[in-house]
Amino acid sequence: TRGAELENPEEERFSKLLCNEFDAEEVNLAINGGSNDRIVRNLLVENNIEDYDLAVIQMTFPVRTEFFKDTPSTKFPNGKWFKQPKQAKDAWVKVSPKNNYNKWLHGEDGDIARLGEKFKDHSDFWKYYYMHVTSVKYFETKEKIHYHTIRNSCKIPLVLLTINRWTKLPFDLQLDDGTRQMKHKNGHPNKELHKHYAKQIREILR
């Protein structure tokens, strides 16, 4: 979790509170709207998990994803093409439909009229993908693949969390109980709820 909607996320999010308890250094790689695809990429490609003592990984809604946007080439007057170097991690584009899509997908009251608003690139493609290509079964399978990939790849102590209240998988901790208690306007946990999560994770680690 990045700590969205907190006044001071770097100090108030549960990952920081947990590290304070153990007198440990926090390494938080979360971004707003990140996907399980991004988690697995960071776990298998961008980082070496064995450099750490403990992993607390919060999976998210399986409808989210990402794609790699290559750096465009520029043609100079001499006719030669030059490709501006850019770090690969900066070229990954997140794809995160509004939460109403999750509700609609699972047969709940979710208005998807504005589905494409959060798609910065290829909006028509992603709208078609989410409306006509994917399904609950598809996303459940995708989540299961990510879940077991993380479990099997993490060779250090791991606490695996989720905010997906529709999941059927045995996570160590479910962070969404379906209510809006102790949550901010946009549904993110407030300072007190982050304290509660840190306490729950400590109990799991005992």
Language-model regions, residue ranges each:
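Serine-esterase "nucleophile elbow" of acetyl-processing enzymes
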Residues: 1-38, 42-47, 190, 196
